[in-house]
Amino acid sequence: MKIKTGARVFALSALAAMMISAPALAKIEEGKLVIWINGDKGYNGLAEVGKKFEKDTGIKVTIEHPDKLEEKFPQVAATGDGPDIIFWAHDRFGGYAQSGLLAEVTPDKAFQDKLFPFTWDAVRYNGKLIAYPVAVEALSLIYNKDLVPNPPKTWEEIPKLDKELKAKGKSALMFNLQEPYFTWPLIAADGGYAFKFENGKYDVKDVGVDSAGAKAGLTFLVDLIKNKHMNADTDYSIAEAAFNKGETAMTINGPWAWTNIDKSKI
């Protein structure tokens, strides 16, 4: 089984989107727009856009980044309060939409054609669009050039590389094995899937975690652990610390990891 370290393996992504609050539409305050976004998700950039919008339209824009935004939004929106617009990852959309907290959006085809189709799939609920995609975050293989000048092209190369690095007191790869967000790309790389996606929707009766592809990917991961090339107890903090200290040559992480990587100066 040749599992490449390219885009197919690390296709799992989190899609951030702009959602319009349905309760807010019911009690719009003329001349004012309140937007919520997480503090680490382009807050400063959005604030600048808000200033320009305010200057162009005369509508006051307030950008806020409350703690635990994703938990506070349904609480306040359920009572008709909260922001007019919220930016968050698409994994929360279904629950919000099911509770009637989001307004349907109707971008024309010309606008939709500007973005990849899968981004619209991520913000569709019961056949209706409930948000605008604004960004996609994906996992990637991050490597230390001092330890691995040329990263492996297939997963099958990792055991040999790990043995070579172990002789130098290092290891080849560490990443979070406690959350399926990080392990799923490997499981899905050879055709594994959670629910079958057809005709624009998921079939919850067609579960693919027991498929041949899923078994192949998981078996490969288990073999890496059995052969001591990886440790089953590795979590996010352990993997991050090992990579940033130069103890392991490679890790699998997202763009949010780069701040600490840069600080480590490896």
Label each region the model flagged.
Residues K2, L12-S13, L25-G95, K109-Q112, ...:
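Conserved N-terminal structural module of periplasmic/extracytoplasmic solute-binding proteins
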Residues H65-F73, D91, E156-E157, N231-K245:
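Short helix-initiation/N-cap motifs at beta->coil->alpha
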Residues E71-G82, S99, L147, K163-A167, ...:
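Short helices/loops that flank or line small-molecule/ion binding pockets
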Residues H90-S140, N150-D162, P185-L186, G213:
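Hinge/lid segment of periplasmic solute-binding proteins
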Residues P107-L115, L165, Y193-A216, K263-K265:
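Short, solvent-exposed loop/beta-turn-alpha elements that line the ligand-binding surface or hinge
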Residues I130-V134, L139, P159-D206, T248:
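Extracytoplasmic/periplasmic solute-binding protein
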Residues L161-D162, D203-D233:
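Glycine-centered hinge/linker elements that transmit conformational signals in sensory
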Residues T219-I266:
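Extracytoplasmic/periplasmic substrate-binding proteins
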